[in-house]
Every structure is written in C-alpha cells, then in structure tokens.
Amino acid sequence: MTAADQAATIQRIFHPTDFSEDSHVAFAHALKLALIHRAELTIMHVDPTVAPEGFEDFPRVRPTLTQWGVLPENSSKADVANLGLGIRKIRALAADAKQAIVHHLTASPTDLMVLATHQHEGFARWLHHPVAEPVSREMQVATLFVPSHVGGFVDRATGKTSLHRMLLPISTDPPSQPAVDAAGKLATQLGTPPITLTLVHAGEEDIDGLHLPQNDSWTWTQLFGKGDPVEWILAAGAEFDVDVIVMVTKGQDSVLDLLRGSTTERILRGARAPVLAIPAPQV
C-alpha cells in the first residue's frame, strides 16, 4: 500500500485466524478498525480441526458488538449491515495456511491485514512454512501484527481504544514517510488525546524531508541512538510504554514471508505493543 493508499479510507480488512484464545485480541482490533472505517471484514478460518459446519459461529461478531454497546441484544445481520459493516467468513482452501492467505490476497486484494503474533515466534503458530518468494514479494499489503500477550490499543471487552503513545522507527532506506502518514491517520481515527508520536533514529537520519502532520493534541518528539536499531526500537517501546509501533518494511521483507532475522521480524518477536507494518513503495 502506498502512502496515498494508506491515507485513503480503508474499505477491506482481512483477518486470518485459528480462533484460539491467543487470537481474540487481534480479532478485537480487526473488528474495531472495520467498524471505524465502515469496511468489509473478511475473516479466514485457518484451523482444519474445526468442523466445516461450525466455523461460521466464530468469532462471534454480533455478541461482541453487543458487549461493546454498539448493537442491542438479539440483533440481526441487518443491524450489522446498518452499521456500514460487512462481514465475510471463509475457510482456508489450501492445506497450508500461508498458501491459502496468498491465494486469497491474490484473488481479493485488501487494504489492511490483521494478524495475531506470538512472543518468541514472531508469527502465528500456523505461519511457519515459507511461501514461494516471488509470490510473497508481490503481496504489498499493510499489516497490523497484534501480539497475543498484550492488550493492544483496543479493549477486547469494551471496544474502547487507548492510543496515547506511538513509536515510529525512522530511516532513509526504506523511506519513512508512509509510516508517518499512517501514524497520523491512526492517531486521527483512534487516538485518545493527548498523543505523543516519537521518532526513533537508529543513527543520524535526516528528517528534514519528512512531512509531520500536525494537531493541537499531538506532540512530536525525537530519539537518537547508535548501534543495533532493533535494540533501540524495542528499548524505546518498553521505556515509553508505547501503544503501537508504526514502521515501513522493505519490499523483500514481505509481510507474508518476512526474512528470518530481518529488522521487522526481530521487532515482532520482542515488541510489547502491536506493530503496524507499511510496505515500502515499489520503485
């Protein structure tokens, strides 16, 4: 997704899930974002152990929206549609979950993907095997990675957001403007003022070329460090207890086939907050 695309209204959100307990926080984020954007939310069921006749019952969209106070008790599918929210539930058609995701995204491009991640693994349990590199490199899709061991910025029980502190790793390669644009939009839509947006420079990067969106309730700050950029990013995230990390990933660091040991994956392994990864513009 380009910076211009990210700035546009999100119309399609894709959420692959195994419906495990660990996936519930990611589902809450996917549903809240779909609700805010009045978007179509496609939920792909990737657990082959659940019977076909039972998969449509989970996750429970209407009960969740009722719990959040968005829908009344005993609401109908029409009530969901009246919110401007579209819900599609599909099963993975390939035995390998990664292949199923790639097939789906190839046939039905999305504006945002929401994935649960697991500490020390970086990926959901069902995303272990690599996908053919040429295919994964073409999957230019912004992805919100939500660690299963944190609450994130959407309260699973109430649907309320808590987005006060945002961290943006800055670099010249890839350029960081798409991350800045995405962070500004996220702060506008879901932020809870006052909001602090911190730029982390793992080096002496020049930000003169960056356009920082302004808002009376936002404060932009900067941190500079030398050495391992991942260590600086994770340390800053922990010290400031950030609610989300927003960063640009290189084209070859595809969100579906992140290179083992890449900066993005190492951040996913150690992050204590959701990570919004924006693919670098293709040249």
Explain the meaning of each model-derived region.
Residues 70-94:
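Phosphate/nucleotide-donor binding subsite
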Residues 151-163:
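Intrinsically disordered, low-complexity Ser/Thr-rich linker and spacer segments
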Residues 2-60, 160-224, 240-244, 283:
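Small/aliphatic-rich secondary-structure junction motif
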